[in-house]
């Protein structure tokens, strides 16, 4: 076995109405605006040492089609680091549009869960640059901007994706997202034991990052609220990750 890849801390830039916001537990009615200038925020994260950014088109997630691609293109030009982009990407044309906008990796959620043929075609198109979002509430995958329960277990879906050749998933425990209550280590570890996993939801500081970085199969973490609320600095999280 070769050396473990460096653990990546992804500062989150969640876009809604052209602004950088955070939602609590995916609830569009519980929104907090953190920055009216997402492009400037992306530059700031890069300046402070981020090796990649996680950008979510929340308007797209709710509408079922990409909405913020022009802004994502601006962020990609300004940031100087790779973007992992998701939100409303449900067709191959959406995948290609995200790539044209500057996405280094594309996160596909709802369509990949609901339509196996689509995810196989997306995998053929993107290869290792495809990340499938496994968003779970109480261990059951949710879709359509987290508004619907799929009835599929997170571990079950992870197993299917691994068998198909998907290289990574983004696992979000919805109950923790935007809360700063701490990462869902046990549930994340269950998925990461099946397929390489980027953790998301609830990370509150360096202790969570250290614990995730030590968990077999966890290759990164998306951090939003903890950074925007000042619970931790990016520098602290990068140091905890070993980078």
From Swiss-Prot:
Catalytic activity: 1-(5-phospho-beta-D-ribosyl)-5-[(5-phospho-beta-D-ribosylamino)methylideneamino]imidazole-4-carboxamide = 5-[(5-phospho-1-deoxy-D-ribulos-1-ylimino)methylamino]-1-(5-phospho-beta-D-ribosyl)imidazole-4-carboxamide
UniProt entry keywords in alphabetical sequence: Amino-acid biosynthesis, Cytoplasm, Histidine biosynthesis, Isomerase
GO biological-process terms attached to the record: L-histidine biosynthetic process; L-tryptophan biosynthetic process
EC number: 5.3.1.16
Pathway, per record: Amino-acid biosynthesis; L-histidine biosynthesis; L-histidine from 5-phospho-alpha-D-ribose 1-diphosphate: step 4/9
Recorded family membership: Belongs to the HisA/HisF family.
Residues of the active site: 14 (proton acceptor), 135 (proton donor)
Protein name: 1-(5-phosphoribosyl)-5-[(5-phosphoribosylamino)methylideneamino] imidazole-4-carboxamide isomerase
Gene that produces this protein: hisA
Database matches in InterPro entries: Aldolase_TIM, His_biosynth, HisA_bact_arch, Isoase_HisA-like, Isoase_HisA-like_bact, RibuloseP-bd_barrel
Disulfide bonds: none
Primary site of residence: cytoplasm
Localisation per UniProt entry: Cytoplasm
Molecular function via GO: 1-(5-phosphoribosyl)-5-[(5-phosphoribosylamino)methylideneamino]imidazole-4-carboxamide isomerase activity
GO cellular component, as recorded: cytoplasm
Keyword check for RNA-binding: no
Domain of life per record: Bacteria
């Amino acid at each position: 076995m070769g050396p473990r890849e460096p653990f990546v801390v992804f500062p989150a830039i969640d876009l809604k109405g052209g602004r950088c916001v955070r939602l609590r537990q995916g609830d569009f009615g519980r929104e907090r605006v953190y920055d009216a200038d997402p492009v400037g925020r992306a530059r700031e994260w890069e300046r402070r040492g981020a090796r990649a950014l996680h950008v979510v088109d929340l308007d797209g997630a709710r509408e079922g089609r990409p909405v913020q691609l022009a802004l994502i293109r601006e962020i990609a030009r300004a940031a100087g680091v790779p973007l992992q982009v998701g939100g409303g990407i449900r067709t191959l044309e959406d995948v290609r549009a995200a790539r044209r906008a500057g996405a280094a990796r594309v996160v596909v959620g709802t369509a990949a869960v609901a339509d196996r043929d689509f995810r196989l075609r997306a995998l053929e198109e993107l290869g290792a640059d495809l990340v499938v979002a496994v968003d779970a509430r109480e261990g059951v995958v949710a879709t359509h901007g987290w508004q619907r329960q799929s009835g599929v277990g997170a571990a079950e879906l992870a197993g299917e994706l691994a068998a198909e050749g998907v290289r990574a998933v983004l696992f979000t425990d919805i109950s923790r997202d935007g809360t700063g209550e701490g990462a869902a280590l046990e549930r994340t570890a269950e998925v990461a034991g099946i397929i390489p996993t980027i953790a998301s939801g609830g990370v509150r500081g360096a202790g969570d990052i250290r614990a995730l970085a030590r968990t077999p199969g966890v290759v990164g973490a998306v951090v939003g609220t903890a950074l925007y609320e000042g619970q931790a600095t990016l520098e602290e999280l990068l140091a905890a990750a070993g980078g």
